[in-house]
C-alpha cells in the first residue's frame, strides 16, 4: 500500500531488470491488484492471469512444460509474438516441493560476453532469423527474428532476446547459414546457463518476482510434482505501461 515502497521496487526493476518483494499476502487477489496500480495487464492466450502448477496428476497431459515438474532451461516468454511482453511477474502462493529453484540470467551480460569473446557467434545471433512457434490446444502463434534483436546495432538497449526451446525454433535462413546458426545457438545456451551469470533462489509463499522478459532469461530446476505443491500466479505488463 506504500507508494514509496512500490516506486523503489519498480525503480530496481527498470534499472536491473529484476526485483523481488518478500512477505506479500499469498492470495490470488494480491498480484492483479498490485499490477493494475501500475498499468493494464497484458493479456495473452493464457489469459490476463495464469497459474503455474504441475497438472499431470489431475488434468491429464499438460499442454506446456511449465505445467510439469521438468527442468526448464533459460528462456524468455512468448518470442512467438511480434512484441513479446515487456515484464513478467511471478507471485508464489504455495511451495512445499523439494527442488524447483528459480534461475535468472541477465541477458545484457550474456550479450556482452558473446560480443567480446565469441564475435562470430554474436554476429550470427544478431543477424540470422529464426521462426518461433507455439502450438497450444486450440491455437497457434508464430513470429520470426534473430535470437538477439537490437533496435539499433550500436545500442545495447532496447533489447529483445528471443530465447526459446530449440524444439520450437526453426531456422529461417539460407541452408548454407544453418550450421553456423546452430553453433551460435549452442554457444548462446552455454553462456546463458553459465553459473557465473545466474542467480538462483527458491520461492517462498509471499515472494513476488518481477523481471524484464526481453532482457532476463528465466528457468527452474526440476522437482517431483507428486511430492508437495508448487503454485505460482503470473501475469505480464508491457514496457510502455511502466
Set out the residue ranges of the language-model regions.
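Active-site environment of non-heme Fe oxygenases that use a 2-His-1-carboxylate facial triad
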Residues: 1-18, 23-24, 28-242
Amino acid at each position: 500500500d506504500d507508494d514509496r515502497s512500490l516506486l523503489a521496487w519498480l525503480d530496481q526493476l527498470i534499472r536491473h531488470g529484476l526485483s523481488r518483494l518478500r512477505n506479500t499476502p499469498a492470495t490470488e487477489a494480491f498480484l492483479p491488484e498490485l499490477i493494475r496500480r501500475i498499468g493494464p495487464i497484458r493479456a495473452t492466450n493464457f489469459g490476463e492471469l495464469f497459474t503455474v502448477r504441475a497438472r499431470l496428476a489431475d488434468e491429464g497431459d499438460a499442454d506446456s512444460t511449465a505445467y510439469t515438474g521438468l527442468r526448464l532451461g533459460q528462456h524468455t516468454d512468448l518470442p512467438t509474438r511480434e512484441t513479446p511482453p515487456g515484464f513478467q511477474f511471478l507471485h508464489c502462493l504455495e511451495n512445499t516441493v523439494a527442488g524447483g529453484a528459480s534461475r535468472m540470467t541477465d541477458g545484457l551480460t550474456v550479450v556482452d560476453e558473446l560480443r567480446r569473446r565469441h564475435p562470430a557467434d554474436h554476429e550470427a545471433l544478431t543477424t540470422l532469423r529464426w521462426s518461433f512457434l507455439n502450438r497450444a490446444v486450440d491455437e497457434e502463434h508464430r513470429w520470426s527474428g534473430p535470437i538477439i534483436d537490437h533496435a539499433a546495432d550500436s545500442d545495447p538497449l532496447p533489447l529483445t532476446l528471443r530465447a526459446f526451446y530449440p524444439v520450437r525454433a526453426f531456422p529461417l535462413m539460407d541452408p548454407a547459414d544453418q550450421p553456423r546458426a546452430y553453433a551460435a545457438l549452442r554457444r548462446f545456451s552455454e553462456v546463458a546457463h553459465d553459473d557465473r551469470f545466474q542467480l538462483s533462489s527458491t520461492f517462498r509463499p509471499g515472494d513476488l518476482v518481477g523481471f524484464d522478459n526481453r532482457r532476463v532469461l528465466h528457468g527452474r530446476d526440476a522437482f517431483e510434482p507428486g511430492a508437495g505443491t508448487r503454485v505460482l500466479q503470473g501475469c505480464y505488463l508491457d514496457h510502455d505501461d511502466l
